[in-house]
Regions:
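Acidic, low-complexity terminal tails and accessory targeting/binding regions
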Residues: 1-48, 131-143, 185-190, 203-243
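Short beta-strand scaffold positions
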Residues: 100-101, 174, 195-196
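Active-site catalytic microenvironments for nucleophilic, acid-base chemistry
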Residues: 89, 112-116, 182, 186, ...
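Short, active-site-adjacent cap segments at secondary-structure transitions
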Residues: 58, 105-107, 130-131, 200-202
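General small-molecule cofactor/ligand-binding pocket signal
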Residues: 50, 123-125, 240
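Phosphate-handling substructures
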Residues: 2, 59, 70-77, 114-175
Length: 243
């Protein structure tokens, strides 16, 4: 079992308070979350939010984990082409601004999108930072399926669990809360495009209660493309509705 006491108090407090503001309680022992019934959550003051996940990487194609900086973060040719095609279709969404995250594969995705002339500006947002798998780079699900930290983070959904230099799901969701607060303060009534990671999409969906329970329909095999996924629809470089 993952020892939550190994996580700094300030980090746990940030996660706990950010999620509580959105009506989500965390069991401090297990790190498991659930919605608090009949709670009023903050409003979202923009008109719409969509997200484009970074382009497909070598890690995705090889079913490997990647960190923020590992060499397997480079894009596949297919990933670049899909993102280019998506960039040609953005006019119809009438985006006012695009916000993009701080890691290289997200910045590079933004650059691909902006190779097509767009009608919106791009703003870097440090908080738009999804899961960081430092310590697990180049490993597969089968390398990690018996790892206690992996089990805690991905199977038991412990919001505090992470590798020593990686990040937790709790931090990702707290980051999403910061992004929504930034949007409310700076982009009221606007149509927003986020360029980031798949974990940010899930974090946003959790805050905005898109499912009855935060982790409904989440599977590790689905998130990390375990086994033969040649017939599975992938959303790398593809736009998704958030709000």
């Amino acid at each position: 079992m993952f020892d939550n006491n190994t996580i700094p108090v300030a980090e746990k407090d940030r996660i706990t308070s950010a999620l509580l503001k959105w009506g989500i309680r965390i069991d401090q022992g297990t790190g498991v979350i659930d919605y608090i019934e009949n709670t009023k959550t903050p409003p979202v003051l923009c008109s719409s939010i969509h997200l484009i996940r970074h382009a497909e990487t070598v890690a995705v194609a090889k079913h490997e984990f990647m960190s923020d900086t590992s060499d397997n973060c480079i894009f596949t040719e297919n990933g670049v082409e899909i993102t280019k095609r998506q960039s040609l279709e953005l006019d119809k969404y009438c985006f006012d601004v695009a916000l993009y995250g701080p890691i290289a594969r997200v910045i590079n995705t933004k650059d691909i999108i902006m190779q097509t002339k767009q009608k919106f500006d791009c703003i870097p947002i440090k908080a738009l930072h999804g899961i960081n798998n430092t310590g697990w780079e180049y490993k597969t699900y089968f390398d990690l399926e018996n790892d206690p930290v992996f089990i805690a983070r991905e199977i038991e959904s412990n919001m505090f669990a992470r590798t020593p230099l990686g990040s937790s799901w709790g931090t990702v969701i707290a980051n999403c809360a910061d992004v929504l607060e930034y949007i409310n303060e700076n982009h009221i009534g606007k149509n927003i495009l986020l360029i980031s990671q798949g974990s940010i999409l899930r974090g946003m969906q959790i805050l905005l209660r898109k499912r009855a329970h935060p982790w409904d329909d989440f599977t590790v095999s689905g998130m990390y493309h375990v086994g033969d996924d040649s017939k599975k629809k992938k959303d790398y470089g593809i736009i998704s509705r958030v709000y």
